[in-house]
Amino acid sequence: MDVQHPPGVSSGTGDPGPSAPALLTWAAMAASKTAPGRKPGPAADPDQRVELLRAAAMLLAQEGPGALTVRRIATEAGYSTMGVYSRFGGKDGIVEALFVEGFHGLGEAMTGVPETDDPLTDMLGCGRAYRRFALDHPTSYAVMFERVVPGYEPTESAQIMAHGTFELLVGRVRRAMELGALPVADALETAQRIWAACHGWVSLEIHGLIKIDDPDGAAFERSMVALCGPIELSAPPPRATRASAPRSTRRRG
């Protein structure tokens, strides 16, 4: 089944594989989607949450946020609207679940990068995992970072969970500093700069705004290497002094 993504969100190309967490990939949702109008029996009730989230993800991917109503979600999943309210409390609860599951999947992708004796390579691996997750799951990425559903704001608990994913990068940066691979500085600030650069590149790439041919991510990785190289990321650039400023050689008339 071809999945149509909302305007401004391109389709992913990767296959998450059988080990990817449920509900994190829209391609997997499309492949296993049940037919609208199915009426599950009692034995299927434990799958109600999965089916409702799958239906919400499909609607968001195929038709955009305007189609994301409690009635449409329930119809697509083959349940009554009461099922949506009893499981999630309403539409915002479903979007919240998609938000949380997305960060859970991103966290698993980043923790899947092993620690080696080369912490900069490990950090690059985390950046690579971040990019791959975003390109493979662009709609999930949009829910997580672009607030594509009008009116939805993550709850405090969801934001704490999302921040935990960022802390994974902070830990990698701190380890690189401890091992001498990065100059000792504020690990939180340094990680924020790295994340901002990574997120900016990936967001532009998802929206088709990277105007270079980079299918294997080589240009992305060169950018990350330059950022993580022997530069004191948290130090301001040196300021030129009057004594060091070049003098003009042009004669005054």
Q: Where does each model-flagged region fall?
A:
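N-terminal intrinsically disordered/low-complexity leader segments
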Residues: 1-47, 58, 235-253
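Generic hydrophobic, amphipathic alpha-helix propensity
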Residues: 48-57, 73, 98-102, 106, ...
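Helix-turn-helix
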Residues: 51, 59-93, 97
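Amphipathic alpha-helical linker/stalk segments
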Residues: 100-125, 154-163, 174
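Hydrophobic alpha-helical connector segments
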Residues: 111-140, 162, 190-194, 240-244
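Short secondary-structure transition hinges
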Residues: 132, 136-171, 206, 210-213
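Amphipathic C-terminal alpha-helical segment
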Residues: 133, 171, 175, 195-213, ...
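Amphipathic alpha-helical packing segments from all-alpha helical-bundle domains
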Residues: 154-179, 188-192, 218-221, 225-229
